[in-house]
A protein has these predicted regions:
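Binuclear metal-dependent phosphoesterase catalytic core
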Residues: 11, 162-167, 184, 188, ...
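Active-site-proximal segments of metal-dependent phosphoesterases and phosphodiesterases across multiple
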Residues: 99-111, 211-260
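Binuclear metal-dependent hydrolase catalytic cores centered on His/Asp/Glu-rich metal-binding motifs
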Residues: 169-210, 245-246, 250
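Active-site environment of divalent metal-dependent phosphoester hydrolases
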Residues: 10-14, 38-42, 134-145, 164, ...
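Core catalytic region of metal-dependent phosphoesterases/phosphodiesterases
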Residues: 15-166
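Catalytic phosphate/metal-binding cores of nucleic-acid and nucleotide-processing enzymes, i.e., regions
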Residues: 13-18, 26, 44, 199, ...
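Proline-centered loop/turn at the N-terminus of a beta-strand
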Residues: 131-133, 157, 170, 209-211, ...
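Active-site-proximal beta-strand elements of phosphoester/diester hydrolases
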Residues: 1-10, 168-180, 211-215, 282-288, ...
Length: 315
């Protein structure tokens, strides 16, 4: 079996389309997109009643006079992982008074895009022949899970609640991470991580031959390094450049050391693309450059008893 494994797309439509295209490019039997599927920003297109809409993102302000211009702007935002909505001045004032309504619109757009993406995946890929695994991550609202599970009858696999057969290997999956500065929807303590993993390990029949799809990477490795942040959540830099610190999970590491599965598939830390070994266990993190439209991934070849080869790709 040949797997294409990628993570942390964060709503970027360009990256999603590239992920689907990878099946032909790398002649894979399995597609895995695991962790942090949703974007992080919502940009309004505002009708002030003057014959045009105004919008802006990252310091750029635009006036949109035609439907074609609005669709083009919305697509540019989507390609970069940003959601959009069309509102008038009165609706803008209401949203400013009621921030919780912005959250609701955001969740609606997240689910809408996820459904669109999964529909596209099912159109482009024969899911009866290509194993297609899609897993949320810590940044993703719970509502997103419904969209993935809603495509089960079309062959999309939601993996966190079951053991998945991966070319003769048992796959278990965990989307939770240890606490972050941003208080994301799926966080738990180190003990919580270990408890969740212990339960999933109990489902396995052959632990040494299993593969663990855990969004959070193991601590103190080459795949858990992120920029050090100040109390104001600003990146810390010195004379030698950005300071990097280990931010992975000790609980994940402890469990890998204890059980020594065949392989760990990880993500979460965008800057730490690479691989490492914990004992006999190979652990990989493709990293992410979704904002630049870059697809990062690992191609992994398996036979029923071992990893044949693996390599990192980007494009």
């Amino acid at each position: 079996m040949r797997i294409f494994y990628s993570v942390d797309v964060h709503g970027a439509e360009t990256v999603w389309r590239k992920w689907i295209s990878a099946i032909a490019m790398y002649e894979c039997d399995c597609l895995m997109l695991c962790g942090d599927l949703a974007g992080k920003a919502l940009v309004p297109l505002i009708d002030f009643g003057k014959g045009y809409y105004k919008s802006g993102y990252y310091g750029r302000e635009v006036k949109l006079k035609t439907e074609e211009e609005m669709l083009d702007w919305e697509q540019k935002l989507a390609n970069g992982g940003v959601y959009s909505c069309r509102i008038n001045k009165k609706e803008l004032e209401d949203l400013q008074k009621h921030p919780e309504k912005v959250d609701e619109i955001m969740k609606q757009e997240v689910v809408k895009r996820m459904n669109k993406w999964l529909d596209l995946l099912c159109e482009k890929i024969d899911t009866s022949k290509i194993l297609s695994i899609v897993m949320p991550g810590n940044d993703d609202p719970i509502e997103l899970d419904t969209a993935i599970k809603g495509h089960a009858d079309r062959g999309i696999v939601y993996p966190t609640d079951k053991v998945v057969d991966l070319g003769g290997h048992e796959l278990i999956s965990l989307e939770y991470v240890t606490p972050t500065p941003w208080d994301t929807p799926r966080e738990t303590s180190e003990e919580g991580i270990k408890k969740m993993l212990e339960e999933k390990v109990s489902w396995l029949k052959n632990v040494p031959n299993s593969i663990w799809n855990i969004h959070c990477p193991p601590r103190d490795t080459d795949i858990d390094l992120a920029p050090q942040l100040s109390k104001e959540l600003k990146v810390q830099a010195g004379a030698e450049g950005v300071k990097m610190v280990h931010v992975g999970s000790q609980g994940v590491r402890d469990m890998i050391e204890k059980y020594q599965p065949l392989m760990g598939l990880h993500g979460h830390i965008h800057e730490s693309s690479g691989f490492t070994f914990i004992g006999k266990t190979l652990c990989v993190n493709p990293g992410s450059e979704y904002g630049e439209g870059q697809l990062r991934g690992f191609v992994i070849e398996l036979n029923p008893t071992e990893i044949v080869r693996y390599w990192k790709v980007q494009g």
